[in-house]
Amino acid sequence: MHRIATKPGDLDSEKKLESVRQTPADILFISTADTELSVLAQVWGKRFQKNARLTLSLMQAYPLQHPAGAEHYADNVLCKAKLAIFRLHGGYSYFPHMLDEILHIKSHGAKTRILVLPGTDEWDPELMNFNDYAEPLVRQMFSYFHEGGIDNMELAAEAVELLLELSLIHI
C-alpha cells in the first residue's frame, strides 16, 4: 500500500519526481554532496571491492525529497541493506519524507542499521531520532565527514566495517 499523500496540495509541485534506480547493496551511502560521493567512490570503492562479502552503493540524496521517490527507495533498496548512512544537508526540513520512511520500514521489521548525519558544519540533534547508534558514535562519524580528507574517509570506512561486524553479532 502506498503511503504518499493523495490530497490536493499535499505534494510540492516544485519537486519533480526522479525515478530512483539503484541496485540494493550491503552498504548504502546517500549524500547531498557530489564531491563527497566522488571521494567515497575512490576511497571506499577500492576498499570494499577487495572485500567480496560487502557491496557498496553511493547515491545523490536530492531525488529522495519527493514522497514517491522516498517511498520507492525505502521499499526497494533501503530495506535490503545491512547499513545505510545518510549525510543530509538541511536535515529533516529538507528530507521529511525520506526520514519518515526510515521510521516506517524500521517499524515493519527492516533490519537495516541506520546512521543519519548532518550534511553541514552544524550538529543537528533532531537527526538522532533516526539513528540506530548512540550519540557519541554518531558524533564521531559526523566528525570524519565534517573534517573530510582521505585519511578521515579511511577511518570512516574502518568504522563502517566495525559497525557491520557488531551488527552481525546482535542480529
Feature names for model-found ranges:
Residues 11-16, 41-42, 68-71, 96-104:
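Short alpha-helical segments and helix-capping/turn motifs at coil-helix boundaries
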Residues 72, 83-102, 114:
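Cofactor-cradling patches in redox/metallo enzymes
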Residues 7-15, 48, 52-76:
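A short, well-structured beta->alpha microelement
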Residues 169-171:
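Conserved small/polar residues in nucleotide/adenosyl-binding loops
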Residues 99-152, 156:
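Hydrophobic or amphipathic alpha-helical targeting/insertion segments
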